[in-house]
Amino acid sequence: MRGVTALLPRRAAVRAPYWDTIRYLSGTLVLFGHLVDTLHDREGLVWLYLATWPLRVPVFALVAGWFSSAAPLTRDAARQVALTLLLPYLIVGFLHSAQQWWLTGRWWFYVDSPAWGAWFLLALPVWRLALPWLARLRRPVVWAVAAALVAGYVPWIGGWLALSRTLCFLPFFLLGWKLRQGAYAAALRPGVVWSGRAAVAVLAGAGVLAWCVRRQVDYDWLGMAQAYDSAGGPAIRAAVLLAGVVGALALLRLMPRRRIPVVSWLGAGGMYVYVLHPLVLRPLLHEGGVAWARSWPEQASVVVLACVLSAGLASAPVRRVTWWIVRPARAGAAAR
């Protein structure tokens, strides 16, 4: 039961500031990515979008895996999965439908085709249900990578039930679970000099590489939501998965274990940032979004805007008002 409820950030007697900080950083970067992912001609924003991709959904999936158990689901545990993940998925889908109707006059209820960003709520229960069986494999992460690569050859695996993304981000979920079992523990331990230097080099290298390829990268490669459209598709996806793993591990190694004022506290609302931000961004983007950001100072102000929006969504007042969307099964206690 513990592994199920921990799939989402939860209120506990003693919170882990390390994971809360990671949640908040990752959620903020997801919000930033969705705010700017249509601005392909703003070099600064494109660079930051590419450089931080490994720290967004790959990290969210990894954290979910860390807090998951490979124990078989009981009936009560399966019910809890449905209430904590599938019910929010339906609620969020309805809210997205209503918002789209309000903005465009068109109605579309998101069920088999997840609403913007909501695919993660569908993937989590699938990963959790599959974990007891996947854990029996000798090298589950390797098998998951193979499944992610094969998925690109199946045309009908795409947006339907987010199957492509569910398969393609499964390696990160399983990696998180393996880390909880002790994998790479020595390298990720604070104070290990060589791994700390390697992590700094990885993130610095990601920044340099992102700048060098900022005009060549197709954002669809990072989303991994569709079938391959070229012969080089499998190699590109393998490179994306590798970059995600290396970048996520680098973040885990460098993140301070101690509580960071304000940031760690906001991290308790990390899932609120992830679930709610599309509902906040859609009206903004409908009116032009941040297309005004052209100069470098203006592009920097977009980053500040993303941080402000993320802080607001993760704040206690917002959690008290919106608990019924993100965590309906736990009522208002989760937002206190």
Regions found by a protein language model. Give the residues of each.
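Alpha-helical transmembrane segments and their immediate juxtamembrane cytosolic regions
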Residues: 2-336
